[in-house]
């Protein structure tokens, strides 16, 4: 067990309103990825036991910069990268400057160039939710390529199923990557559901431990009920946001509100939709872990671990 008196906690995967529009086809102009203000995320994280706070908005550090002057915060982001062939991966990058953000964004369509830059700059880089279908399809070479350049692997994601997290943990043992945890919160209710622990006394020591890979993931996995509840919360927040925009007289707000009102009756089907998504996520994780592990075994490097076995060799702070 970790001695809590010698440990600092930080949710290394959390979003704010700066993550931009939803990526779901057809909803981009109606719903945002998140509606929480950076200060609200910080308050929620600290209330739930986090010692440090960072934001990992999609390809943006605007929210993180709002907190950057605080002693318990550091700047991070979630970079949307493309592997050869155009498939997406999400990478968490931590403790970066504005100049590094610009450099990362200019390289995000060339994964090898991005990894060369993070290695040169000693930027911790984590492959987030590696076995999630939400970033699109996977080819067999995508994850090995990502794992060769990353320093960490997210093995405890507060929105992903236990099976998806188990697959990530087993893959991380094969790839010998340090392990991280984060809530992947898109609503305030989910902030700090999962997090990363490092033995440290202050922010400087925490970041040094993060760079050294002396990390331990903690917290819970996602469930069908939590996923459904978060999507319902986002739907309500989307409606409230459009009402405020109409009151302010913003151009285009009224048609968007009308579109949401028209879609409202279909909310009764959301539990069915999320059930299908949740089931697909579990199948996707199992299938792609087996393909990844099979590739390792065929290459004669290591025998793949069984899912659910103790994480021997896992990173420890």
Locate predicted features.
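Acidic, His- and aromatic-enriched active-site or binding-groove loops in soluble protein domains
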Residues: 74, 78, 150-159, 203, ...
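Conserved catalytic scaffold of divalent metal-dependent phosphoesterases
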Residues: 77-81, 90-95, 126-133
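Domain-core and long-helix interface of multi-subunit machines
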Residues: 7-32, 98-193, 221, 258-305
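An N-terminally biased module of ancient metal coordination in phosphate/nucleic-acid-related enzymes
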Residues: 1-86, 189, 278, 282-317
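A structural signal for the main folded, soluble domain(s) of proteins
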Residues: 72, 137-141, 237-240
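A conserved mid-domain beta-alpha-beta active-site/ligand-binding segment of alpha/beta enzyme cores
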Residues: 199-263
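Short, charged, surface-exposed secondary-structure boundary motifs
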Residues: 82-91, 162-165, 190-192, 207-211
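Short, hinge-like loop/turn segments at secondary-structure boundaries
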Residues: 70-73, 91-94, 143-146, 196-200
């Amino acid at each position: 067990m970790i001695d809590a008196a010698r440990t600092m906690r930080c949710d290394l995967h959390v979003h704010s309103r700066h993550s931009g529009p939803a990526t779901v086809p057809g909803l981009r102009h109606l719903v945002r990825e998140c509606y929480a203000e950076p200060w609200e995320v910080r308050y929620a994280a600290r209330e739930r036991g986090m010692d440090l706070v960072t934001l990992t908005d999609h390809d943006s550090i605007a929210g993180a910069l709002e907190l950057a002057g605080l002693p318990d915060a550091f700047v991070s982001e979630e970079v949307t990268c493309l592997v050869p062939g155009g498939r997406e991966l999400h990478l968490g990058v931590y403790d970066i400057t504005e100049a590094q953000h610009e450099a990362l964004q200019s390289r995000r369509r060339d994964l090898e160039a991005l990894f060369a830059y993070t290695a040169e700059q000693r930027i911790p880089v984590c492959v987030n939710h590696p076995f999630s279908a939400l970033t699109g399809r996977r080819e067999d070479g995508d994850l090995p390529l990502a794992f060769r350049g990353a320093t960490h692997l997210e093995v405890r994601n507060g929105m992903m199923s236990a099976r998806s997290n188990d697959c990530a943990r087993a893959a991380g043992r094969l790839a010998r990557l340090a392990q991280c945890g984060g809530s992947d919160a898109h609503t305030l209710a989910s902030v700090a559901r999962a997090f990363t622990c490092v033995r440290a006394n202050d922010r400087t020591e925490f970041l040094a431990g993060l760079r050294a890979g002396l990390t331990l993931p903690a917290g819970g996995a996602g469930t069908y009920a939590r996923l459904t509840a978060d999507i319902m919360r986002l739907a309500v927040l989307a409606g409230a946001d459009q009402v405020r925009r109409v009151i302010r007289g913003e151009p285009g707000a009224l048609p968007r509100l009308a579109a949401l009102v028209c879609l409202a009756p279909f909310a009764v089907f959301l539990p069915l939709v999320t059930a299908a998504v949740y089931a697909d996520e579990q199948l996707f994780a199992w299938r792609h872990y087996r393909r990844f592990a099979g590739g390792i075994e065929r290459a004669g490097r290591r025998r793949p671990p069984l899912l659910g076995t103790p994480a021997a060799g896992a990173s420890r702070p």
